[in-house]
């Protein structure tokens, strides 16, 4: 569902090495399309979507951060007030899986305490031909670190919605139990309440269809 009315506003991050398909995941989720010529992100890309989970309307504001090491310090500035994180690796690239522990450390150190992190193995459509990271080893890492785990394909759309929805469901449970303060997350449909959420300053001024930074050209989805 798409609507201006929502009960909660959650800030999400998509993090992981460059080339894992983070921007493709963002655009598949927010625009319902796959863009094969997606470019490397410099700084961050932004998108949003309103969904209904168990009768509660939630607006997700999603920041897709640059994965290149030279932009790592810049990307860290986007962690403030994030409550949900998709930690993405490419199942056809073992190096990207080897980096998830460092990315996880950043999320847990810099984002909101208790941030919900889901480990996402992207490019599932290539597993049979080019897979380098098994489902078992990724799932083992997730269990050892208290993460949810899912494999996705931005190309086909498989499990993209489920990744975000499962995170939102856990967050709503945390709000209900008092583990996450609703005073920071409760927004409502009245525009005057938007100031109650402490997002990165530029977040409220960027539309869902805009990028917050320039990008460099590429021939494939190297986002």
Swiss-Prot record:
Keywords: Cell membrane, GTP-binding, Lipoprotein, Membrane, Methylation, Nucleotide-binding, Prenylation, Protein transport, Transport. A motif (Effector region) lies at residues 38-46. The lineage of its organism: Eukaryota, Metazoa, Spiralia, Lophotrochozoa, Platyhelminthes. GO terms for molecular function: GTP binding; GTPase activity. InterPro entries: P-loop_NTPase, Rab_GTPases_membrane_traffic, Small_GTP-bd, Small_GTPase. One of its GO terms (biological process) is protein transport. Protein transport. Probably involved in vesicular traffic. It is a lipid-anchor. A lipid is attached at residues 221, 223 (S-geranylgeranyl cysteine). NCBIfam families: small_GTP (TIGR00231). The keyword Flavoprotein does not apply. Belongs to the small GTPase superfamily. Rab family. PANTHER family: DRAB11-RELATED (PTHR47979). GTP binds at residues 16-23, 64-68, 122-125. This is Probable Ras-related protein Rab-4A.
